[in-house]
Structures are given as structure tokens and as C-alpha cells.
From Swiss-Prot:
<keyword id="KW-1003">Cell membrane</keyword>
<keyword id="KW-0472">Membrane</keyword>
<dbReference type="GO" id="GO:0005886">
    <property type="term" value="C:plasma membrane"/>
</dbReference>
<dbReference type="InterPro" id="IPR051047">
    <property type="entry name" value="AccD/PCCB"/>
</dbReference>
<dbReference type="Pfam" id="PF01039">
    <property type="entry name" value="Carboxyl_trans"/>
</dbReference>
<keyword id="KW-0915">Sodium</keyword>
<comment type="subunit">
    <text>The methylmalonyl-CoA decarboxylase is composed of four subunits: the carboxyltransferase alpha subunit (MmdA), the tunnel beta subunit (MmdB), the biotin-containing gamma subunit (MmdC) and the delta subunit (MmdD).</text>
</comment>
<comment type="similarity">
    <text>Belongs to the AccD/PCCB family.</text>
</comment>
<keyword id="KW-0739">Sodium transport</keyword>
<dbReference type="InterPro" id="IPR011763">
    <property type="entry name" value="COA_CT_C"/>
</dbReference>
<dbReference type="GO" id="GO:0006814">
    <property type="term" value="P:sodium ion transport"/>
</dbReference>
<keyword id="KW-0813">Transport</keyword>
<dbReference type="GO" id="GO:0004658">
    <property type="term" value="F:propionyl-CoA carboxylase activity"/>
</dbReference>
<feature type="domain" description="CoA carboxyltransferase C-terminal">
    <location>
        <begin position="271"/>
        <end position="513"/>
    </location>
</feature>
<protein>
    <recommendedName>
        <fullName>Methylmalonyl-CoA decarboxylase subunit alpha</fullName>
        <ecNumber>7.2.4.3</ecNumber>
    </recommendedName>
</protein>
<keyword id="KW-0406">Ion transport</keyword>
<dbReference type="InterPro" id="IPR011762">
    <property type="entry name" value="COA_CT_N"/>
</dbReference>
């Protein structure tokens, strides 16, 4: 055997050893817990045969507590790049079979290098998190490593899409990297994410809670709002990540990929003409509107389990990605509240950062009243929606289907906040408040002095509804561009986005704005 052949054979053996991670037994244990290994996840994420590993031979340089005698394959994290539907994507995948995926100095450097490369070439970054936390033996070096990652999460925010998947434990300082990214996916019954675990909480506060209750996938998808997507297992999670990437551009200088649209662009949906209940206080399902507007009735909902009174989702209109924000009359009548303020603002800003046009569908009676809401800061949280819409420079199209009352009407991408095109159904009611409330204020004295207060109230209510609870007052002042037949909604929205394709808008020069956080 030649010297070169021997060295090649030696290389192959080293790579085979590295590929085994923590060894067969730990791989079997990982599978037994219902989880894929770090390398299996990457192989499933990328188009077949396209993954290129980086820094497989990197090793730690810690000598504390016998670490100099420990060989940690790939430094317990696999990093590299590959193709997702033919587009370059960078990724890192923590290897729980090697010291529980604990993060040390060189582990962090590998992740940072992948992020830096993604920033240079303009490619999304996917982080597959499965780690017990910091490598305690490396002390401050491990903490510094976390800081290096957090810094890059921040400076690359809005530059390339950053996607986090929590596929196991993620505790302590480790949670802040996913929190700084654009999207967090979690797996039901497998993922946990918390700052302090159940044992620490019990010791400090006396509260008893399980890890799943404290930081499980559904907790963060429905209660805290920290995560945006929940999946049933690793494969489903990675499938969802690939689907999300299809709606996103590779970076902030590009547009999202376009897909062919076989739908008839002039199609009309007569069922929308009959959708609106005669009783303005009766609910309907806003998804019945959305599915008639988007291509193939297909959409990917963002935070479907959190603040259900507002719908946020990615979809395509005429083959092009759009971000949809819509009130859901079936939940809290579609009112805006504290949680919906956070949900809307982050979604709007994410779409704007990555050049995804916004479609807003409005049926909003107002901001949710209540002491809890006021004490919780609904003024500040509601202002986030106003800020996000106002600073967004992507094409903005608004469709008002029914109620558009008061400040909530303004907040839902009204003409005043920079909507490029505002359409309304004839059933739209654009006013300072609902007819009943307005009549009781405007005609209070007339009603009080009337011989028959009930009859007078009804008369004034009918008059106000006819004169003001409609889209025509706003249309007369140019705040609504057109009142349309509901059945033509898709056609008119396609036309609007086509017209706005070349939109260019520059905001005043500034270092950065000061969103009401």
C-alpha cells in the first residue's frame, strides 16, 4: 500500500469514528427516546447527497477536570451546508450522544463559523438544538461561546432567515439563541425550553411543575408564545422547516422563490357573497375567506395555537409569497389584545425584513377592554402593531370584510398607516365605534327626552347604521380605494399585488427606530 493510500485509509477511519458520535449504545438510546441523531436530522433536512460537513475534526482544548483525556467527536455539534429544494442553507445540529450536546468554546466556534458563512453568502441558517446546556468543565469559555452566538443571532437578524428547532432539552442561557431567531419549532412531548428547571423552581419558590408543563412544546406554542410551530416528531418538524423555507427568500436582498400558479386568476367565488351573517354580532370563520384568496387554498399558519383571535400565516397569491394577518371573528370577536399585539408585530416585521408582501384582512370591533389588559400594558403592546405596519415598506394590501372600529381599525393596516391598496366589501362598517355605542353617545339627550325611548333608539340606530356603518364614508375620503363584490376578492388582490410588484419606498435615515417593547 502506498503512503498516500494508507493516509486515505486513515482518513476514512477517522471520519467513520466521528460519524458514530457517542457510539452505538448512545445512538440506540437516542432512537429509543423517539429522537433522530444529529447526523440523521441533517441528512433528512437537506436534499439527498448535498450535505457538506465543516470542521469535523475540531476538538476542545480544555484540560480541566480530566477533559484533556476526553475525545468528543465533532465537538458534540455537526455543522455544514447543503441544499434545500436546490437552495443553499447552512445548519448546525447538536449531538446529544456526545456529552449530552453540551456547549463549550470550540462547539460554539463551529456554530459561529457556520453563521458567519451564511451571512457572507446570504443563506438561511437552521439550528437543530438538542443540548443539556453549557459544558461546565469549560466554565467562562462556555459562557463566552454562548455570547458569541447571541451576538451573531442579533447582527444577522433581518439579514438571513434564522430558524431554530428544539429537538430535546434547551435550558438556561441556551434558550436565548433560539429566542433571538426568527422562528422556533418544537416537538410535542420531546422538546423542553426553560431558563430554570422544575427542581430549581421547587427549591426557590416551592412550586411543583413537570418539565413538560413548564417548558414543553405546547406550553410555548399556546401559553408563552415563545415558539411558533409544533410538530409530532423529528421528521415532521424537519418537513415543516423545509416547507417554511419555501416561503422565504435566502436573504434580505432577494425575493422569495416563485411557484407556478395553475389557478384561474379571474376566478370568482360566489359563496363569499353569502358568507357574511345578517346579524353583525354573529361570527364566521375567517379561514373561509383566506382559503378563497390564496393559491390552492393552501397556507402555513404561524403561531396557530397562540392568540387565536388573530390569524397569521404564510401563503402564495399568484405563485408569490405573502404574509397574511387577519382577525378571527370566532375567537373574542377578533378583538386585538396584548398577545395579538406581540404576535402581529413580530410576524409583520419578519415579513418586511425578508421582502414578503402583506395582506391584511380586517374584521375588528376594537381593542379588548378590561383591567387585566390595561394593567398588562395593552397600550404598549397594541402600539407594536401600529409601529410594525408603519415601518413596513413591502407592498401592503388591506381588505375590510365587516367591522373596522376605532383605533383597532387604524391599527389593522389602514390607509393612514401606509396601506397601498385598501379594498372593502359592501358589508364593511368603518366607524369610530359600533352603531349601538355611537347612538347612545350622540343621541343620549334625544333618547332620554323621548316619549318612547326604545322606539327612538331603534330609529336613531337605523339612521346611524345607514349613514355611517358602511364603507362609503371612508371611500368618499379616499381611505378606501374601492368597494368590491366579495366574490371578486381573489381577482382584485392578485391585481393589487401585481401592480405593486415594483414598489420602492425609502424611510427617513436613522440609526434604528425605537419600537415600544
Amino acid at each position: 500500500m502506498s503512503v498516500a493510500a494508507k493516509k486515505i485509509q486513515d482518513l476514512q477511519k477517522k471520519k467513520e469514528k466521528i460519524a458514530l458520535g457517542g457510539g452505538i449504545k448512545r445512538i440506540e438510546k437516542q432512537h429509543a427516546s423517539g429522537k433522530m441523531t444529529a447526523r440523521e436530522r441533517l441528512a433528512y433536512l437537506f436534499d439527498e447527497g448535498t450535505f457538506v460537513e465543516m470542521d469535523a475534526f475540531v476538538q476542545h482544548r480544555c484540560t480541566n477536570f480530566g477533559m484533556d483525556k476526553q475525545d468528543l467527536p465533532s465537538e458534540s455539534v455537526v455543522t455544514g451546508y447543503g441544499m434545500v429544494d436546490g437552495r443553499v442553507v447552512y445548519a448546525f445540529s447538536q449531538d446529544f450522544t456526545v456529552t449530552g450536546g453540551a456547549l463549550g468554546e470550540m462547539h460554539a466556534k463551529k456554530i459561529c463559523k457556520a453563521m458567519d458563512m451564511a451571512g457572507k453568502v446570504g443563506a438561511p441558517v437552521v439550528g437543530l438544538n438538542d443540548s443539556g446546556g453549557a459544558r461546565i468543565q469549560e466554565a467562562v469559555d462556555a459562557l463566552s461561546g454562548y455570547g458569541d452566538i447571541f451576538y451573531r443571532n442579533s447582527i444577522y437578524s433581518g439579514v438571513v432567515p434564522q430558524i431554530s428547532a428544539i429537538l430535546g432539552p434547551c435550558a438556561g442561557g441556551a434558550v436565548y439563541s433560539p429566542a433571538l431567531t426568527d422562528f422556533i419549532f418544537m416537538v410535542d412531548q420531546t422538546s423542553q425550553m426553560f431558563i430554570t428547571g422544575p427542581q430549581v423552581i421547587k427549591t426557590v419558590t416551592g412550586e411543583e411543575v413537570t418539565a413538560e408543563q413548564l417548558g414543553g412544546a405546547m406550553t410555548h406554542n399556546s401559553t408563552s408564545g415563545c415558539a411558533q410551530f409544533i410538530s409530532q416528531d423529528d421528521k415532521a418538524c424537519i418537513d415543516d422547516i423545509r416547507r417554511l423555507i419555501s416561503f422565504l427568500p435566502s436573504n434580505n436582498m432577494e425575493k422569495a422563490p416563485e411557484f407556478g400558479c395553475e389557478d384561474d386568476l379571474n376566478i370568482q367565488f360566489p359563496e363569499l357573497d353569502a358568507l357574511m351573517p345578517d346579524n353583525p354580532n354573529k361570527a364566521y370563520n375567517m379561514f373561509d375567506v383566506i382559503t378563497k384568496i390564496v393559491d390552492n387554498g393552501d397556507y402555513m399558519e404561524y403561531q396557530p395555537h397562540y392568540s387565536k383571535n388573530i390569524i397569521t400565516c404564510f401563503a402564495r397569491v399568484n405563485g408569490k409569497s405573502v404574509g397574511i394577518i387577519a382577525n378571527q371573528p370566532q375567537v373574542m370577536a377578533g378583538c386585538l389584545d396584548i398577545d395579538s399585539g406581540d404576535k402581529c408585530a413580530k410576524f409583520i416585521r419578519t415579513c418586511d425584513a425578508f421582502n414578503i408582501p402583506l395582506l391584511t384582512i380586517v374584521d375588528v370591533p376594537g381593542f379588548l377592554p378590561g383591567v387585566t389588559q390595561e394593567y398588562g400594558g395593552i397600550i404598549r403592546h397594541g402600539a407594536k402593531i401600529l409601529y410594525a405596519y408603519s415601518e413596513a415598506t413591502v407592498p401592503k394590501v388591506t381588505l375590510i370584510t365587516r367591522k373596522a372600529y376605532g383605533g383597532a381599525y387604524v391599527a389593522m393596516c389602514s390607509k393612514s398607516l401606509g396601506a397601498d391598496v385598501v379594498l372593502a366589501w359592501p358589508t364593511a362598517e368603518i366607524a369610530v365605534m359600533g352603531p349601538a355605542g355611537a347612538v347612545n353617545i350622540i343621541f343620549r339627550k334625544d333618547i332620554k327626552d323621548a316619549k318612547d325611548p326604545a322606539a327612538t333608539t331603534k330609529q336613531k340606530l337605523d339612521e346611524y347604521t345607514t349613514e355611517f356603518a358602511n364603507p362609503y364614508q371612508a371611500a368618499r375620503r379616499g381611505l378606501v380605494d374601492d368597494v368590491i363584490e366579495p366574490k371578486t376578492s381573489r381577482q382584485r388582490i392578485v391585481d393589487a399585488f401585481n401592480m405593486l410588484e415594483g414598489k420602492r419606498e425609502k424611510l427617513p435615515a436613522k440609526k434604528h427606530g425605537n419600537i415600544p417593547l
